[in-house]
Curated annotation (Swiss-Prot):
Keywords: Repressor, Ribonucleoprotein, Ribosomal protein, RNA-binding, rRNA-binding, Translation regulation, tRNA-binding
Name of the coding gene: rplA
Recorded GO MF terms: rRNA binding; structural constituent of ribosome; tRNA binding
Provenance organism: Hyphomonas neptunium (strain ATCC 15444)
Keyword RNA-binding: yes
Assembly mode: Part of the 50S ribosomal subunit.
Highest taxon of the lineage: Bacteria
Task of the protein: Binds directly to 23S rRNA. The L1 stalk is quite mobile in the ribosome, and is involved in E site tRNA release. Protein L1 is also a translational repressor protein, it controls the translation of the L11 operon by binding to its mRNA.
UniProt protein name: Large ribosomal subunit protein uL1
Family from the record: Belongs to the universal ribosomal protein uL1 family.
Length: 231
């Protein structure tokens, strides 16, 4: 424990907590401090000027990260007939209808994303208590309820990241791995920030983006200059 504490203190000392860094500087700092024995995730957190308890201040959308996430995403698709075939051809890990409903209802959860064709939502809706708390319920706002299941599967596999504001007014996501190049992480960070700014709700007043922080799994947070956050 002492060694871990010493390492944490050493990492803290490399970051000036009174400063906001450029995206490129922040990426370099975060990567240089990602010294765990595993490939740490690089994570972004954005504090927003919204109160999510109001319907017109909800923030939810999806962004395709240009350099991917570095994670293997398992995709389940609720579809029938030709649409089921299209989903499988696009790389879905499990495809079904009533049979998949029974599996999931029985506790099967070996997937990270759920996609459904519109005609399947009557069935999928009955899984709300199972999928909802895990953030897995398909939603047309983020492109997971769609007749174009093939594209949705490709997006999910290729770096599509859903985000939703939390009670404290924060959105966060993984934007890569420490093993990614600086340029790839920078592209992902900029894409995520842009997507959040575009998702500004009608009820948001004043400054929308209040704070942007980049960190690794075991590292300390590094503040990003809001001028670069396009607020």
């Amino acid at each position: 424990m002492a060694t871990k504490g010493k390492r944490a203190r050493a990492i803290e000392q490399t970051v000036d907590k009174t400063k906001a860094y450029s995206v490129s500087e922040a990426v370099k700092l975060v990567k240089s401090n990602a010294k765990a024995k595993f490939d740490e995730s690089i994570e972004i957190a954005i504090n927003l000027g919204v109160d999510p308890k109001y319907a017109d201040q909800q923030v939810r959308s999806v962004v395709n990260l240009p350099a991917g996430t570095g994670k293997t995403i398992r995709v389940a698709v609720f579809a029938k007939d030709k649409k089921a075939e299209e989903a499988l051809a696009a790389g879905a890990d499990i495809v079904g209808a009533d049979d998949l409903f029974e599996k999931v209802n029985g506790g099967f959860m070996d997937f990270d994303r759920v996609i459904a064709t519109p005609d399947m939502m009557g069935l999928v809706g009955r899984l709300g208590k199972v999928l909802g708390p895990r953030g897995l319920m398909p939603n047309p706002k983020v492109g997971t309820v769609t007749p174009n299941v093939a594209q949705a599967v490709k997006d999910a596999k290729g770096g599509a990241v859903e985000f939703k504001v939390e009670k404290a007014g924060i959105v966060h996501a993984g934007v890569g791995k420490a093993s990614f190049s600086d340029a790839d992480i920078e592209k992902n960070v900029q894409a995520f920030i842009s997507a959040v700014v575009k998702a500004r709700p009608s009820g948001a007043k004043g400054t929308f983006v209040r704070k942007v922080t980049l960190s690794s799994t075991m590292g300390t947070g590094v503040a990003i200059d809001l001028a670069e956050a396009k607020s």
